Structure formats: C-alpha cells, structure tokens
A protein has these predicted regions:
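Switch/communication elements of ASCE P-loop NTPase nucleotide-binding domains
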Residues: 1-105
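Acidic, Mg2+-coordinating catalytic modules of nucleic-acid enzymes
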Residues: 95-227
Length: 227
C-alpha cells in the first residue's frame, strides 16, 4: 500500500510539471497488483494511466481489474507464452489480439488467448457478433447463420433442445445449436432446462465453434470481395 500511495502522489505531482522539466523515465512493474485489494488495483491503474501520459510504462499483469479496463484497448498489448522449443523459452506475440473486434481486445478475448480461459463475457461477445452479422440480429437469425455455416464448412452438429414457455404460456421445445442454448442459459439463468453445469461444461467448445464460424464468414466475405 505504501508503494501505491507513492505512485499516486508521484503521478499527481509530475502531471503538473511542464514538458521541459520532466526527465525521460521508464517505469517497469512486474505484477504490481499483488496483495492489493481490487479497489487498490483500480487506484493503481489510474495512477499508471496518468503517468503513461508523460512517461513510458511497461507492466506485466494477471489482474482482471487491469484487463477489464477500457484503457487497455488502446494500450500496446503483448502476450508472453512459454515455449520450450525456443532458446529463450518465451514467445512474445501481439497480432492475435487484433484479430476479432474493431474496438480492440476485450477482457474476455485477452483471457481466452493469454490464459486459455473461456468466459461468458467472451461467449456473449462472439454471439453478439454473429447476431450483428445475421439478417435480423435475433437469436433465431444467429442460430440460422450458425447452422448455415456448419453446412458450408461440412461440419456435423447435434442440435440441443431449449424448452421454454411462449407468449401464450404454452411449453415450447426449440431445436437450437449449442452456442444458442448456452447464450440462452446465460441470459435466462432461471430456466434450468439444460441442467446444472451446462454452461460450464460446454463453454469452451461453443467458443471454439463460434471462432471457426467467424473465421469462415470472414474468409467467405474476402473471397466475394476478390471476385
């Protein structure tokens, strides 16, 4: 906490200095969020963002507070992974974070690529992307787009049954793709028709499915533009 207080104070003082009086510091911090309360992490991030306006700041982090900040979307993000086949055992990658969304990498996307961790946030982002690409931005239209893509990709899929009551109170059983059923389970947690643990058990598979479909749709679009 002492280090946090010093950084906050330092950021406040140096942000008021004129350009000519500032020295060219570079800040290197290795997981500065360790042992900090989430609110403390948020304050630390604010201080580092203030400092980064005037000096270069390089931070290694696993903090969801840091990664969830919209400010991260404009940062220069690097992914460091261990690879025993290289001399240094470390591979640094940047391009992967720029592959999906125009507004920059999201927290869910970073967790997926950096930690191999599927999240409901990333699933929602991918499904929303498919809804935007479909004819009417509805679940039904997105599900139709998924099924059409499966046929074009020659991929077999087993439909899931989503049970619900319609507007007249009658029971309905809809055949939907896995991704649509997970989307519905996330948005309607009171509906237990898929059983306990359905989302957790199938989240990773569904994300992989949608990533393949999005890749297919983009390749199809590029081919049409090239004609």
């Amino acid at each position: 906490m002492t280090a946090l207080a010093l950084l906050v104070a330092w950021a406040s003082v140096h942000s008021n200095k004129t350009v000519g009086t500032r020295k060219p510091y570079i800040f290197l911090l290795d997981e500065p969020e360790i042992c900090l309360h989430p609110r403390g992490q948020a304050r630390l991030l604010d201080a580092l963002l203030t400092i980064s306006k005037f000096y270069q700041v390089i931070v290694t982090t696993h903090s969801p507070i840091f990664l969830h900040s919209p400010a991260v979307r404009t940062a220069n993000l690097l992914l460091c992974q261990r690879d025993n086949s290289t001399a240094s055992n470390v591979v640094v990658s940047q391009a992967r974070f720029r592959s999906l969304f125009l507004h920059g990498p999201t927290w869910g996307e970073i967790c997926w690529h950096a930690y191999n961790m599927p999240t409901v946030e990333f699933h929602d982002e991918l499904y929303s992307y498919l809804q935007d690409r479909s004819s009417s931005a509805t679940v039904e239209a997105a599900d139709k787009l998924l099924r059409l893509s499966f046929d074009e990709m020659n991929e077999h899929h087993t439909p899931c049954i989503w049970s619900r009551k319609d507007n007249k109170g009658k029971n309905r059983r809809d055949k939907l793709t896995l991704s649509s059923c997970i989307r519905n389970s996330i948005h309607h947690p009171d509906n237990k028709c898929m059983g306990e643990g359905f989302v957790e058990k199938n989240l990773e598979e569904s994300i992989n499915i949608m990533l393949r479909v999005i890749k297919h749709l983009r390749a199809k679009e590029e081919a049409q533009l090239a004609e």
